[in-house]
A protein has these predicted regions:
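Positively charged n-region of N-terminal signal peptides that target proteins for export
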Residues: 1-4
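Tryptophan-anchored aromatic micro-motifs
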Residues: 23-44, 122-128, 136, 140-144
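N-terminal glycine/threonine-rich, aromatic-flanked beta-hairpin/loop signature
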Residues: 41-78, 122-128
Length: 145
């Protein structure tokens, strides 16, 4: 009888764990390829912005490319058909970047991603690497879970 109870308990524990860690609709990886225009010699310069979301506290924005290498810890808050992304800190846990410059305040909105009929729309709010505040574009694309 003990093996049956042990197997049942393990099965229930795994099921409960699966429920507790079920993926949220916004969880996943999003990428925005920002074209900066041609550089010296006519070569096109880009910055790749990768947003990774795994629950509200599991949020990172990594920007890499032309003269850019930055990781931001963020908070991702679902609000219906929108995902609000706010600043927590830089990857080192500080509010100043690796050059000692404070670009954002904790809790400051960076951008909002919204579900639209034709895909995702990004509205920029404070993210310094993007277009001006309030501008909207089809920037981030979901590329994986």
């Amino acid at each position: 009888m003990k093996p049956v109870f042990a197997a049942l308990a393990m099965g229930l524990g795994l099921a409960a764990g699966s429920i507790a860690h079920a993926a949220q609709p916004w969880d996943g990886t999003y990428v925005y390829e920002q074209a900066l225009g041609p550089g010296a010699g006519g070569t096109q310069n880009f910055v790749t912005h990768t947003l990774t979301v795994s629950g509200p506290e599991g949020c990172r924005v990594v920007a890499q490319g032309f003269q850019t290498d930055e990781t931001i810890r963020c908070k991702a808050m679902p609000d219906g058909n929108r995902l609000l992304v706010t600043f927590v800190s830089f990857d080192n846990g500080k509010v100043e970047n690796k050059y000692g410059v404070k670009l954002y305040s904790p809790g400051q909105p960076l951008f909002v991603i919204s579900q639209a009929p034709n895909g995702l729309v990004t509205t920029w709010q404070g993210y310094s690497k993007a277009a001006g505040d309030g501008a909207s574009s089809a920037a981030f694309k979901k590329v994986g879970r």
